[in-house]
């Protein structure tokens, strides 16, 4: 179900659960979207932001096609890493994570990522997690191990492995695993409640019927999603590294608790590489957003780089790529600046511009409707820019044409989030008078004087661009 929209059309998304591209349909309005948020033990790195920008594109596309969206993104403020950091500094978990939470919100604003409706903190849902664990214990789906931690018995969930396409009966399972993160070779019963260890956990723990401790990472997302979106959601998204074990374990827990399908669609973005290699602090190719901003790149340029490739393709992050994005954005800014100049007034849009605009909007919409094919959408945009620039150069371009194209660009920017538009540009009278004097000199073929007026305009911070429809003025 969706709200009425002139952009309504079929949207196809690749569902990791079925390994196929499927027609998207929401169960009810609004679309229930849950995305895995940051683990706030450190500053988020650009690999994280590749996933967050993909999720932003997904959300913006849903909105573009007329869907209302309820978006939940969790804040993991208790796990192995956050707890270790707080204990190392001998401060509370809240004190340790607060700066990184604040930095995360600053970073997503820098990247023009639309905010979620709710950012639940895992530590705010501990009572609900304890209640869920008790239910799983009561139903013999979970058990208390010899180490006093509570574990989920994956053999009690016959379809375990369906998301990551693991066949439980074909695998040698370890007895259990307490770490939040592990690989398929260590497939095992996973921890729901990690028993308190004073040497490891210091002063950080919660009381529960099964003893002191803290919840497992996988349970946190299940409970926050179900508490805020209900037992069944429409879309769950994250990075490919979340498929196993995190999302696999979420399904097992959630469906054991509700006896309903947890999520109808699962979407995952591919890895980000740096100079063709996996990002690693030891290789010196580990970047936070702040590292790149300090090196002179803008949030807009970084967003463009993270956005421009299809989300299911690995993205190779290079400085050369960022510089290329800078040039692409300059081309976009120059085009918008050209459109924002004054043109001869007209009440009608030219037939050619009208047709080009409709063709472009269809190509753009069809591209993003095809599993968020942003590369094809951007190609359509640059083709349209080329066509429009050619039309402006050779034809009588009017204010109605310019306004029509600017409206189109503003519409597609609700998806892209990379274009910047000026308020109505006010060219100072002094500049416009010099432009008029230059035109008089040009008509009189007094080229030296015309060049002098052009230089005076430049000294005031403006550039004159000559076209068949007359001179255009833009700020340098």
UniProtKB/Swiss-Prot annotation:
<dbReference type="GO" id="GO:0008270">
    <property type="term" value="F:zinc ion binding"/>
</dbReference>
<keyword id="KW-0648">Protein biosynthesis</keyword>
<comment type="similarity">
    <text>Belongs to the class-I aminoacyl-tRNA synthetase family.</text>
</comment>
<dbReference type="InterPro" id="IPR032678">
    <property type="entry name" value="tRNA-synt_1_cat_dom"/>
</dbReference>
<feature type="binding site">
    <location>
        <position position="281"/>
    </location>
    <ligand>
        <name>ATP</name>
    </ligand>
</feature>
<keyword id="KW-0067">ATP-binding</keyword>
<dbReference type="InterPro" id="IPR056411">
    <property type="entry name" value="CysS_C"/>
</dbReference>
<protein>
    <recommendedName>
        <fullName>Cysteine--tRNA ligase</fullName>
        <ecNumber>6.1.1.16</ecNumber>
    </recommendedName>
</protein>
<dbReference type="InterPro" id="IPR015273">
    <property type="entry name" value="Cys-tRNA-synt_Ia_DALR"/>
</dbReference>
<keyword id="KW-0030">Aminoacyl-tRNA synthetase</keyword>
<feature type="short sequence motif" description="'HIGH' region">
    <location>
        <begin position="38"/>
        <end position="48"/>
    </location>
</feature>
<dbReference type="InterPro" id="IPR015803">
    <property type="entry name" value="Cys-tRNA-ligase"/>
</dbReference>
<dbReference type="InterPro" id="IPR024909">
    <property type="entry name" value="Cys-tRNA/MSH_ligase"/>
</dbReference>
<dbReference type="Pfam" id="PF09190">
    <property type="entry name" value="DALR_2"/>
</dbReference>
<dbReference type="GO" id="GO:0005524">
    <property type="term" value="F:ATP binding"/>
</dbReference>
<feature type="binding site">
    <location>
        <position position="246"/>
    </location>
    <ligand>
        <name>Zn(2+)</name>
    </ligand>
</feature>
<feature type="short sequence motif" description="'KMSKS' region">
    <location>
        <begin position="278"/>
        <end position="282"/>
    </location>
</feature>
<feature type="binding site">
    <location>
        <position position="250"/>
    </location>
    <ligand>
        <name>Zn(2+)</name>
    </ligand>
</feature>
<comment type="subunit">
    <text>Monomer.</text>
</comment>
<feature type="binding site">
    <location>
        <position position="221"/>
    </location>
    <ligand>
        <name>Zn(2+)</name>
    </ligand>
</feature>
<dbReference type="GO" id="GO:0006423">
    <property type="term" value="P:cysteinyl-tRNA aminoacylation"/>
</dbReference>
<keyword id="KW-0862">Zinc</keyword>
<dbReference type="InterPro" id="IPR014729">
    <property type="entry name" value="Rossmann-like_a/b/a_fold"/>
</dbReference>
<feature type="binding site">
    <location>
        <position position="36"/>
    </location>
    <ligand>
        <name>Zn(2+)</name>
    </ligand>
</feature>
<keyword id="KW-0963">Cytoplasm</keyword>
<dbReference type="GO" id="GO:0004817">
    <property type="term" value="F:cysteine-tRNA ligase activity"/>
</dbReference>
<keyword id="KW-0547">Nucleotide-binding</keyword>
<dbReference type="GO" id="GO:0005829">
    <property type="term" value="C:cytosol"/>
</dbReference>
<dbReference type="InterPro" id="IPR009080">
    <property type="entry name" value="tRNAsynth_Ia_anticodon-bd"/>
</dbReference>
<dbReference type="Pfam" id="PF01406">
    <property type="entry name" value="tRNA-synt_1e"/>
</dbReference>
<dbReference type="Pfam" id="PF23493">
    <property type="entry name" value="CysS_C"/>
</dbReference>
<keyword id="KW-0436">Ligase</keyword>
<keyword id="KW-0479">Metal-binding</keyword>
């Amino acid at each position: 179900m969706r709200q009425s929209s002139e952009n309504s059309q079929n949207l196809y998304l690749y569902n990791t659960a079925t390994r196929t591209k499927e027609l998207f349909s929401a169960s009810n309005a609004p679309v229930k979207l849950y995305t895995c948020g940051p683990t706030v033990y450190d500053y988020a790195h650009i690999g994280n932001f590749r996933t967050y920008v993909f999720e932003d594109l997904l959300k913006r596309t849903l909105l573009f096609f007329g869907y209302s969206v309820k978006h939940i993104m969790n804040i993991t403020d208790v796990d192995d890493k956050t707890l270790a950091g707080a204990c190392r500094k001998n401060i509370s978990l809240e004190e340790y994570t607060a700066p990184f939470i604040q930095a995360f919100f600053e970073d997503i604003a820098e990247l023009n990522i639309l905010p979620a409706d709710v950012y639940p903190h895992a530590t705010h849902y501990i009572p609900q997690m304890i209640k869920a664990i008790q239910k799983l214990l009561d139903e013999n789906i979970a058990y208390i191990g010899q180490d006093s931690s509570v574990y989920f018995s994956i053999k009690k969930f016959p379809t375990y492995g369906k998301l990551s396409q693991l066949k439980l009966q074909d695998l040698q399972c370890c007895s259990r695993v307490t770490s939040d993160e592990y690989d398929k070779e260590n497939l095992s019963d996973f921890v729901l409640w990690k028993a308190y260890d004073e040497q490891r956990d210091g002063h950080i723990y919660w009381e529960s019927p099964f003893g002191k401790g803290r919840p497992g990472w996988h349970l946190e997302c299940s409970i926050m999603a179900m508490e805020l979106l209900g037992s069944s959601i429409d879309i769950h998204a994250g990075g490919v590294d979340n498929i196993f074990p995190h999302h696999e374990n979420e399904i097992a827990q959630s469906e054991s608790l509700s006896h309903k399908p947890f999520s109808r669609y699962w979407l995952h973005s591919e890895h980000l590489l740096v100079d063709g290699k996996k990002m690693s602090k030891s290789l010196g190719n580990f970047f936070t957003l702040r590292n790149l901003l300090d090196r002179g790149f803008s949030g807009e340029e970084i967003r463009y780089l993270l956005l421009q490739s299809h989300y299911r393709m690995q993205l190779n992050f290079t400085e050369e790529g960022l510089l290329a994005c800078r040039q692409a954005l300059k081309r976009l800014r120059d085009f918008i600046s050209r459109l924002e100049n004054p043109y001869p007034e007209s009440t009608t849009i030219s037939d050619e511009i009208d047709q080009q605009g409709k063709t472009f909007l269809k190509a753009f919409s069809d591209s993003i409707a095809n599993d968020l094919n942003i590369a094809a959408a951007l190609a359509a945009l640059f083709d349209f820019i080329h066509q429009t620039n050619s039309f402006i150069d050779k034809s009588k371009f009017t204010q109605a044409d310019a306004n029509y194209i600017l409206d189109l660009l503003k519409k597609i920017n609700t998806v892209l989030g990379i274009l910047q538009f000026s308020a109505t540009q006010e060219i100072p009278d002094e500049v416009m008078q010099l432009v008029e004097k230059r035109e008089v000199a040009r008509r009189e073929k007094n080229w030296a004087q015309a060049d002098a007026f052009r230089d005076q305009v430049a000294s005031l911070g403006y550039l004159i661009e000559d076209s068949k429809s007359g001179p255009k003025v833009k700020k340098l």
